[in-house]
Amino acid sequence: LNATIGIARTLADEDVGKSLAEIQNTLFDVGADLCVPESSESESSSLRVVPEQVSALESTIDTFTERLEPLKSFVLPGGSPAAAALHQARTVCRRSEIEVLRLAETQAVNQQVLVYLNRLSDLLFVLARAANDDGHDDMLWVPGQGAA
């Protein structure tokens, strides 16, 4: 996930890139949190994902959403290279969330990790839309257009 976001970051503008850099740093906290089961009493407890990190994502979602036109249809992945890379990062994030859910079936997992990954995928969608707001249009789904 972090590497995929890194690729998107190389293609993104400065605003989006700054947000992605912060996310990449926090993803190391996510990894550290997952390495030490919730039930462990460890010095690593300072590396747990906390609600404030989720709140920071939500604040960034709000900031970028305010700049965008409201959606009138589902968005197809694509548009600018940065947007396409962000859509790809979003799908990797969703897969990561599913894997953490599977892990939670067998061991204690900090629920904030799951909340963080869920909100991160939403933010990556918003950032993909923002990346297309620089002169590229979002590619909108047209029902039935793909029918032969």
Q: Where would I find each of the regions flagged by the language model?
A:
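Phosphate/pyrophosphate-binding loop motifs in nucleotide- or prenyl diphosphate-using proteins
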Residues: 2-148
